[in-house]
Design a protein with these regions (language model features):
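Acidic, metal/ion-coordinating pockets
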Residues: 1-158, 165
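Short sequence/structural segments immediately N-terminal
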Residues: 29, 49, 142-310
């Protein structure tokens, strides 16, 4: 439960409302928020929320194309005679143990290229970080049973036109996050991080080769995406963000923008006093601080290291 986490939640619920979602499932991630914060927000946005771990409703019924659909979050909330769809944050291995549901959609973070069929249940998964939209079409027989299905991923790239109402919500979110950063207590100043210009006094050829890497333009990618004031993004696109003498903002500490020498080789003031003292080597562990599975799924240490070698 963090200030930025709350802003994200508010933006998501507002967006779901504008997009007229039929149902939204609350799971483990939402447990971090107190109910006196979360549920007034749900009421305000008129969000059709389902939650298995509270007094809130655990299922709801809607009708689409003359088919009665029961959407639930509790495996026990199945309705006989309806088409039953379960929303779950359980891993696929646990979803396979749930019987009696026609479709189970998981949000466990696992990537399923195609839905699985398990004991007459179709198990599908949302795409990590919502980069693709899953479209699942069911073929329903005259007996109301699922006879087959078709599935495809729709990439949500620039070719998909943005909804102006949702874009307004996201712009408002970015503005509020930027305000959080401005109002946050700035870490103590100090002669700690030197910046690439100081390193270049002795390592000028290395600076020149660094300029040709994507690390050198890391902060510009945030500016283009409108995320240059987002703390969750800044930490991997600057030097020493959140630390004494590290990057604070592009206005106050422009010399520490981008992924520079000290972000990878570490902070070692002793090296300036004794040049024979080497900086730390750039191991895979160092890279994995930012090149996580979530943000850099194709990361391959030897391949990526070659791209920044100098």
């Amino acid at each position: 439960d963090t200030p930025q986490g709350r802003l994200k939640t508010e933006a998501m619920l507002r967006s779901f409302s504008k997009m007229k979602y039929d149902a939204v499932a609350f799971g483990e991630n939402e447990k971090v928020f107190p109910r006196n914060y979360l549920y007034p927000l749900v009421k305000e946005n008129k969000t059709p929320v389902l939650c298995a771990a509270s007094e809130k409703r655990r299922s709801l019924s809607i009708t689409r194309s003359d088919i009665k659909l029961n959407i639930g979050v509790d495996p026990a909330a199945r309705h006989e005679g309806n088409l039953n769809l379960l929303l779950s944050d359980k891993p696929v291995s646990e979803a396979k143990l749930i019987n009696g549901w026609d479709v189970i959609i998981t949000s466990s973070g696992e990537e399923l290229e195609e839905p699985l069929e398990n004991n007459e249940t179709i198990i599908a998964a949302g795409y990590p970080k919502g980069k693709n939209l899953g479209i699942l079409k069911l073929r329903i027989g005259i007996n109301g049973k699922v006879m087959g299905h078709d599935h495809r991923w729709q990439p949500l790239g620039k070719e998909i036109k943005e909804d102006p109402l949702v874009r307004d919500i996201l712009n408002d979110y970015d503005s509020k996050v930027a305000r959080l950063l401005r109002e946050a207590e700035r870490p103590l100043a100090g002669a700690t991080y030197s910046g690439v210009k100081k390193c270049a006094e002795c390592h000028q050829p290395f600076e020149e080769s660094w300029k040709d890497t994507r690390h050198a333009g890391a902060f510009q990618t945030l500016e283009k995406a409108g995320k240059s004031s987002d703390p969750e993004c800044i930490k991997c696109h600057s030097v020493g963000f959140g630390e004494k003498g590290g990057f604070y903002s592009i206005e106050t500490t422009p010399d520490l923008a981008n992924v520079q020498c000290e972000e990878c080789h570490g902070l070692d003031r002793g090296h300036l006093d004794d040049f024979s003292k080497p900086m730390r080597p750039v191991t895979e562990k160092v890279c994995l601080k930012c090149h996580t599975e979530e943000h850099s799924p194709d990361f391959d240490y030897p391949v990526y290291l070659e791209k920044i070698k100098h």
